[in-house]
């Protein structure tokens, strides 16, 4: 590399500073120069001298005539940054970059006595000649106005990242005033159940999940969580006990990221079986503007449970060879010694058009009802793909949910699970300060022969059984229902549901107990602050569903998803009585639960004859058209008792530490491979992100 004897011959130099009322940057050589014009000249000439000293090009460029366009800045610390260089030869570009990198630090520009960055453009031509003989002037072929405009645009571009940083602000619990859904957890909903059901409140409580904004007028999560805060100083303590793992918040956006777990260790003493669950969870919740919110979670799990629960999972094995469906979670493959590996993903995007209309699209859960169970739509299944539209006006809230459910018992020709579609409608009406009445309808049709989503079912009006007949008698099935809630006092309300599956008036009132008399009934009562003990709550509930309800003569057109009932987790053909007590104090909580059930099961695995208990049987094989009673088939009695005590470790992430004790006694008239006498005592210790209800009361 030969040192190029640089002589300066500058045909054009244009400097344009980025803002008015600014001084020029000052080299050490210019410290004693007075007035702005002289400082400008000193800065320009000194810069050119220092560039000349640092530009070392190979001998090949001695005779090169090369125009070079430069844009650079001096930041608020006085450091030169070359933003743009245009030249034909790559070596010239590289040398200019190196030269600017090696320029000394200067005093930055001053704007109103504050250091600020300034930006310049410059055009040079090689070979360069003696700088002292050069008279600085603007290029004639490139007007100064154009260069100034270019510089200002680049200044704006360079400021984009700083603008994002300037818009950022500390996270301040934006989630608690957003339209993010509150996780469907009985422990979480119990915190505000009394407040949202006071006489005179207008919340439509049968349609769940609620959003934080829905609940805020009655229960302020942000305020209540601050009461529980430990206010630790260390990062680890704050993230473990009080805060989300990571949060980002700005002028029109926010999101919170958490890493959760569901770790359980236990023992089924009645069957001499160690149990465990190992779930790792990554989940994000956020909002863009005031109207768009979202949630997404990934669960990666392995587990082994009490013997009765493992057997139930295996009895629901899909048709494609997987060994099990874990109730409440989904299809599982084998893991380790009689364990399961069952990944789950869930999430949604929610858009709030205005105070009257809301749209949500997701793969998640919904619940309709005021009870512990629902005979309309429950949250005991795996997440279901859906589109949900809510309309709220006057004293009414109207919900339309369009779902795509999977039949894991049946495969298409391509080997995929067959699908069916469900159009569900629920109208909630606050009749007065105390009484709420709801109307329900669900239409189900299968996707055989690639029928797809029948747009006839997009009709948002209730009670359109006529659609079924207009598309053919084999089109699908329709269920209708009625629910109510009555607030007796601020501390007591009763509730109920009546479900009618494929209403046939003659058979319902015929008196011969026809198999077409398919209905379900729920009655319940909640008592808050029982016996004047704050946060002590009681609940009593009775449920019954007659045989053949939720099933259909086409097996794929039942009311189920991934082998699980979309309504009551027992499916059909049962009576059930439930008593629940709950108590909470600060971060501590506890509940006790007792459930008694009279149930009927299919004597044979192939559901022939069909007694109406298995949703996947067909009405073509019914045991009898008349004389149908609850408990028919293989009659069973079951009791289920549960005690759980826990501590809310982190309210923001819903992370809890708990101990759970279950005693289950199940006796059946006829022992077989699927149903047999079994007594279980299952003790479990867990550390869990409480993001969904997980039911074990089978």
Feature map (PLM): residue ranges:
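Outer-membrane beta-barrel channel domains
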Residues: 160-436, 443, 447, 512-516, ...
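Exposed, low-structure sequence patches enriched in small/polar residues
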Residues: 342, 435-443, 448-698
